[in-house]
Regions:
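Transmembrane alpha-helices
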Residues: 128, 132, 188-192, 199, ...
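Transmembrane alpha-helical segments of polytopic membrane transport and secretion proteins
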Residues: 1-22, 313-327
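Transmembrane alpha-helix signature in integral membrane proteins
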Residues: 79-109, 234, 302, 308
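Transmembrane-helix boundary motif in ABC transporter permease subunits
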Residues: 6, 94-126, 147, 313-322
Length: 327
């Protein structure tokens, strides 16, 4: 007869194993952050706060860094990475705002309003879109959206208005945000759909019994209940958006230029170059010490941004719970 192991002993072993695995994961993350920041520190130390400021053409600055002596005592370059930071914030923020709105509306439609046969079609399609490689989205952008914007949305007069500042070709902030929105939306839709399905049916039935219409029930009951899931989906999507490089290199223009809102509508047609694209495009220069340190600095900014976003989302749930806005 088999000897039975007490459930408490089994639970204790499982807890210890999971705790050990969690500790290993935490250690790996800490080592990764320390390694990247350590390798990036010389770039920050050499430039000081000017690293985050604006200055001459950042592409020319990166060229000077590539040709700079390897000895830190003889560094002669300066880097002002504001155009890259600004482009990263614009593209990621724009795509995240558009993506959250689109994903929430799409998830509500799938769960609350779509007929059952249509739901069985839409959900696998959403999961499939979430798994499509970014280079495919980049090809669609290059072959479809970039020519469309360059040939039909940007007039000759608009191109000439900024010709002495930047060249408008279709590779633009608008295309980058549009494609990135389509890339990150399926991830958020899938997570929000799962959360909406977990909302107790009794809550909605109780609201309907009180005479509340269907849309008001969805917004006041279902959406309110899944706010933590929406936050989690947004954080996960923002992490992917921050790290996206290949697709953005293909459609954003890859020019170290800070799009100017004072240019009016032309602003959305101006090219940009986010940090992730700068890392990929300059990856062959890792062997050049000052250039490699600069690329590590770009990576450190992206890594720390993702960590702070995750921490921010975690602490954002506390006031929601305090005021009874989460289950």
């Amino acid at each position: 007869m088999r000897r039975l192991i007490p459930s408490t002993l089994t639970d204790t072993r499982a807890e210890r194993m999971l705790g050990a695995l969690a500790s290993v994961v935490l250690l790996v993350i800490v080592l990764m952050v320390v390694s990247v920041v350590t390798k990036a520190w010389p770039s920050f130390a050499h430039n000081g706060l000017g690293w985050f400021g604006s200055g001459p053409n950042v592409d020319h600055q990166l060229g000077d860094i590539f040709n700079s002596p390897a000895d830190p005592a003889h560094y002669v370059y300066k880097l002002s990475a504001w155009p890259l930071l600004y482009a990263t914030a614009l593209i990621t923020g724009g795509a995240l705002v558009c993506g959250v709105v689109f994903a929430l509306l799409a998830a509500i439609f799938i769960v609350e309003f779509a007929p059952r046969p249509l739901q069985r079609v839409l959900e696998p399609v959403v999961r499939l879109l979430a798994a499509v490689p970014s280079v495919i989205y980049g090809l669609i952008g290059v072959l479809v959206l970039v020519p469309l914007v360059g040939n039909h949305l940007i007039s000759t007069q608009r191109k000439e208005s900024v010709i002495y500042v930047v060249q408008l070709s279709g590779n633009s902030l608008l295309v980058a945000v549009a494609i990135l929105t389509v890339m990150i939306a399926p991830i958020m839709i899938a997570l929000i759909v799962v959360a909406l399905r977990a909302v107790p049916v009794g809550w909605r039935e109780g609201s309907a019994a009180l005479g509340v219409n269907r849309w008001r029930t969805v917004w006041t009951i279902s959406v309110r209940a899944v706010r933590p899931a929406i936050i989690a989906a947004a954080v996960l999507a923002s992490a992917r958006a921050l790290g996206e490089a290949i697709m953005l290199s293909m459609v954003s223009g890859s020019v170290g230029f800070a799009p100017n809102p004072l240019d009016g509508l032309t602003f959305v047609f101006e090219p940009a170059r986010p940090l992730a694209s700068a890392i990929v495009e300059g990856s062959e220069g890792f062997s050049v010490k000052p250039y490699g340190e600069t690329l590590y600095a770009f990576g450190a900014i992206l890594l720390l941004s993702s960590l702070f976003l995750s921490l921010g989302a975690h602490y954002a749930k506390r006031p929601l719970r305090k005021f009874g806005l989460t289950p």
